[in-house]
UniProtKB/Swiss-Prot annotation:
Enzyme class (EC, first level): lyase
Catalytic reaction equation(s): a ribonucleotidyl-ribonucleotide-RNA + H2O = a 3'-end 3'-phospho-ribonucleotide-RNA + a 5'-end dephospho-ribonucleoside-RNA + H(+)
Keywords linked to the UniProt accession: Disulfide bond, Endonuclease, Glycoprotein, Hydrolase, Lyase, Nuclease, Secreted, Signal
Record-linked Gene3D superfamilies: Ribonuclease T2-like
Principal subcellular localization: secreted
Protein name (database record): Ribonuclease S-7
Amino acid sequence: MLNSPLTSVLFVLLFVLSPIYGAFEYMQLVLQWPTAFCHTTPCKRIPNNFTIHGLWPDNVSTTLNYCAAKENFKNIEDDTKKDDLYKRWPDLTTAETYCKQHQNFWRHEYNKHGKCCSESYNREQYFDLAMALKDKFDLLSSLRNHGIIPGRGMKYTVQKINSTIKKITQGYPNLSCTKGIMELVEIGICFDSMVKNVINCPHPKTCKPTGSNEIKFP
């Protein structure tokens, strides 16, 4: 677990703001592994760490997308905030300057998912929360400490990855793989509706390799 300014933001968001709960039942932080993502999508850069795909409020019985909300996305003007976001939540398909100027990826994620928790978190709080939750777990270092190390030719069973992430976060994750080549491309970490505790993801989309039950972690 990391200590950072955004970790302090997390405590403020959870305990001081006292947001209204009930519009969503759980929250999923979706982290993507850039190496695998960029094997199937042209990228401008490939960070050697997990990056944020999105922070998705959801319900167990239905999927929440493009919810009605008073606040639409407005471009982030603060340069420090843009730097913080780009470090943790970059658009891998565009150059840094373009990403920060046009903010298409952040706009898409907020309009599709962030508006579904707007009764609890405004736009600024939503992005702060996503970054703080990512910083809460140094997932790559933790996986390495448990013997799961990315690299060319590295393979692990789905069960080992699931159980290891359970040890790290206290909840079973949502694993996604690229089709065909079975590379681990995303890890979803689920939180309760108050975003205080990690829970088992309600609808885990685990990777389903054939034969050896191993998936690649490139």
